[in-house]
Structures are given as C-alpha cells and as structure tokens.
C-alpha cells in the first residue's frame, strides 16, 4: 500500500522495470548482528518505532541487500535478488482517498 493521491502515468511499467532491474542485478544478501545500543543510533537502520522492539532483544539482526538497502529485519530472505524471479504488477487499485494498493506476482527464476 502507498500513500498517493493518484498513480502517475506509466507507474506500473516504471516500477516493474525498476524492480526487475534490481532483481537481475543479482545483489547478494548479507546478514549480520549489531548490539541494540549501536543499532538504535542509526535512524536509517531501524525504520520502525524502536519501542516496538522488545527490551529483551539485545542483538538486532541486520539485512544488507548489498548496494541497495540495509536495515534491521527479522524476516526470511533469499541469498541474492536473482532468486526472486520476474516481478509483474497485476493490478493497481484505490483503497480510499490518498491510499493506493499494488498487487503483484513473482514468476519463477
């Protein structure tokens, strides 16, 4: 979901091209851990509210999509972007004033 009044002309095609370009770049995914005290100092690293991370968590898992993005993340990840397969937008829709939704599928790599 996105906070947009309208989708710009050519939105779906442009997003598909950008996503597929990054997928085809075969960027490696690296996992590391940082002490919580270090991680919370980097606003780009933790993009959610720090208070949502339980106080008992002393090490923050960091996922680095090398050359593209690096952030705290506890989810499951592929080893490289090429494993994702081709990205295709199947539908764009309005979910109310200022809110848009993009539906997509991933085709086998």
Where are these predicted regions, by residue range?
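Active-/binding-site microenvironments in catalytic and ligand-binding cores
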Residues: 1-109
């Amino acid at each position: 979901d996105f906070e947009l009044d309208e989708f710009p002309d050519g939105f779906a095609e442009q997003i598909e091209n950008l996503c597929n370009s990054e997928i085809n770049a075969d960027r490696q995914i690296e996992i590391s851990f940082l002490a919580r005290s270090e991680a919370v100092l980097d606003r780009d690293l933790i993009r959610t509210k720090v208070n949502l991370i339980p106080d008992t968590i002393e090490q923050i898992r960091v996922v680095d999509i090398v050359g593209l993005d690096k952030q705290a993340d506890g989810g499951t990840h592929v080893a490289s972007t090429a494993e994702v397969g081709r990205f295709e937008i199947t539908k764009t829709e309005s979910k109310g004033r200022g809110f848009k939704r993009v539906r997509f599928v991933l085709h086998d790599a």
